[in-house]
Regions:
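Short, glycine/polar-rich helix-capping loops at beta-to-alpha or helix-loop-helix junctions
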Residues: 93-96, 171-179, 196, 244-249
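Glycine-rich beta-strand-centered segment in the early N-terminal region that forms part
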Residues: 22-38, 50-92
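C-terminal capping/lid region of NAD(P)-dependent oxidoreductase domains
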Residues: 289-298, 306-328
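Mid-domain Rossmann-like dinucleotide-binding core that forms the NAD(H)/NADP(H) cofactor-binding site
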Residues: 118-193
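Short glycine-centered segments of the SAM/dcSAM-binding site in methyltransferase folds
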Residues: 84, 142, 166, 232-233, ...
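Glycine-rich phosphate-binding loop and adjacent beta-alpha segment
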Residues: 219-291, 324-328
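NAD(P)H dinucleotide-binding glycine-rich loop of Rossmann-like/cofactor-binding domains
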Residues: 45, 78, 84-147
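Short amphipathic alpha-helix with an adjacent loop that forms part of the alpha/beta core around
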Residues: 196-206
């Protein structure tokens, strides 16, 4: 089969589509012929050597995919050759085939494109996990979702909206702010020219929010804590703004705040299956009905993965960037 292989050129990663060894699959797994995958920040970091895959996981990039079932393991009864599916992956998505545990698969709606299917698993499950399972977001509460124009952001805004929460968000361009408002954000703040903590406190008459979902990290920590209500939660899912920061424990103790660090990729198979099932019960019907939807910015052929990575690295995308695999 073919897959994207990472090679170094003057310490810069070069992504090449070339022949690699075929993969095997276990009795509880399904072999899927991939039609589309997607670019995530984790892929950019892994390509540069900063985010190695968990032990035992394929070194091939790609944390999600859509495709066609090509073969099933002996223990698999609920999937058949030819089924259209999508799934969260620990790795291996930038390839022609991948092996997936059968309980991680979701059926791709007939009206959906391969690109739409590949735009869902990683970011929608990440947003669901951290807003509703870790963050315990409830109807009537207020949430600040940073990086609202990202894949996780565009998914999170919609799910929070549908759950009955008031949504605030940050983004770095007028286009992204407009899209966030269209998706349901009550207030979209340009972090490049506005103080988001001041804007949030003004918009909430000094009350703040119940939950902050933050992929930025260190540089936002103090402001995030400042705007949280009593018993508020800060869920940290990234370190784009740095790993370290001073913390005012007075805010944490005085308001009984919780700071939660959360990653999806490193969780056990059992945890991922549980998260997938809960997401399917709560939000899959809304996706099928078109009440919420994956936001896709651009689609690249897989042979242009290098250009797709640069596009995401430059923060040009609103929503997901997809890689499609041509079927010969």
């Amino acid at each position: 089969m073919k897959a994207i292989v990472i090679k170094a050129d003057n310490k810069k990663p070069v992504l090449i589509w070339q022949e690699v060894s075929d993969i095997s699959f276990g009795p509880a797994e399904v072999l899927v012929a991939i039609r589309a995958t997607a670019v995530n920040r984790a892929d950019l970091l892994q390509a540069r050597g900063y985010y190695p895959p968990p032990e035992g996981v394929s070194e091939i990039l790609g944390l999600e995919m859509s495709g066609v079932v090509a073969a099933v393991g002996a223990e698999v009864k609920n999937w058949h050759v030819g089924d259209r599916v999508l799934a969260l992956l620990p790795g291996g998505g930038y390839a022609e085939h991948v092996a997936v545990h059968h309980d991680l698969l979701l059926e791709l709606p007939q009206s959906w494109s391969w690109a739409q299917g590949a735009a869902v698993p990683e970011v929608w499950l990440t947003a669901f996990l951290n807003l509703f399972l870790e963050g315990q977001l409830k109807p009537g509460q207020a949430v600040l979702i940073h990086a609202g124009g990202s894949g996780v952001g565009t998914a999170g805004i919609q799910m929070a909206r549908e759950s009955g929460a008031t949504v605030f968000t940050t983004a770095g361009s007028d286009q992204k702010l407009t899209k966030c408002r269209e998706l349901g954000a009550r207030l979209a703040i340009n972090y490049k020219i506005q103080d988001f903590s001041r804007e949030i406190l003004t918009a909430t008459a000094g009350q703040g929010v119940d939950l902050v979902l933050d992929p930025v990290g260190g540089s936002y920590l103090q402001q995030n804590l400042q705007i949280l209500k009593e018993n508020g939660r800060l869920v940290s899912i990234g370190l784009l703004g740095g790993r370290t920061a001073e913390i005012d424990l007075g805010w944490v103790l005085g308001k009984s705040l919780r700071i939660i660090g959360s990653r999806l990729r490193s969780r056990s198979l059992e945890e991922k299956i549980s998260i997938t099932r809960k997401f399917k019960r709560q939000f899959w019907p809304l996706l099928n009905e078109g009440k919420i939807w994956p936001v896709i910015d651009r689609v690249f052929p897989i042979i242009e993965a290098q250009a797709a990575h640069e596009y995401v690295r430059e923060n040009r995308n609103i929503g997901k960037v997809i890689l499609e695999i041509d079927v010969v």
